[in-house]
Amino acid sequence: VLSLFLFLFPESKVSASVNNKTQNLGEKTIEFSELSEEQQTYFLYEGFDENNQYFQQTIIQQPATEGTLQQRVQANVLFITGSTKKITSTSAYTSYVINSSNAPILRTDTRVTLNGYKSFSSSVIPYNSPYVSSGGIYSSYTGAEKYFSVSLASQITTTMGPGAANCRAGGVTLGN
């Protein structure tokens, strides 16, 4: 499965370790035009545009070793895509889209971290187990003005089990 993925997406760089269930194919910065039509529509609705930075990570969930033949031979590819924008001098909004290629999403536990300061979390149980889940998390900082790099981490549970995805989500200057 990994060989096929790398053949189809040769620009991908395998940059992380493999555990017993998932494989991290790394993070990349992408342009607005590289987002799927569905992702573009969502980010535009959230107030983002082609001037924002977008970051994406790819995770492969390995096929099950038990269950039906289809469950045993089909891998699942998870994508998490995120971006952050400043709302006020003390608050920011990070929007994200999670895509699952072959397994419905049962739950997402997502955390946005203003690096070196604080994390903000959200848990979602998507209605009707969709293959796409999206959301956003507000963050705030009221100290002296400071630049924060923003990171996005999500524990994504699908019908194939859990997968963890982490990526940058931009940066923002906050404070008074």
Question: Model-derived features: where do they sit?
Answer:
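N-terminal prepro-regions of secreted/extracellular proteins
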Residues: 1-87
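Mature secreted bioactive peptide module from preproproteins
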Residues: 63-176
